[in-house]
Amino acid sequence: MRKVILAVILMLLILLLNATLHAAKWEHLASSGVYVYYYDVDNIGYLSEVTVQIILKQTYEDKDSVNQFYQKYATDENSIELEDYSISTMVINCADKIVGIKSIISYKESGEVLLQTNFNNINYLFIPSGSIYEALYDKVC
């Protein structure tokens, strides 16, 4: 019995250590007045000499105000459940200064996934001057 308890404790410690090692390290990128943006500094992937994959987290500066705005226009047919945060996988081509979105996942604070969208074909857009994407470009390119 003692060996079983010791094995369970050891497994829990391994799981805890594994979760800690793979936790995202979010660094503040910018704020827009409505949203706050962070990027995961530990998971920047250089896919080629000019292409970078980044994980971007978006939260609200004042979620209650945004929620009140959405609920003002919601009806029974189109009720809106506002996420607490979203995680996007972005791809930036540094040479051409373009950005595309690979996926977006919207979450509740509990970790429950509200919506997940994966894009098979990435549509790239030029990075506008002064945008969140330019701030991200400046960090990783």
Spans of model-derived segments:
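Bacterial N-terminal signal peptides
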Residues: 8-16
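Positively charged n-region of N-terminal signal peptides that target proteins for export
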Residues: 1-4
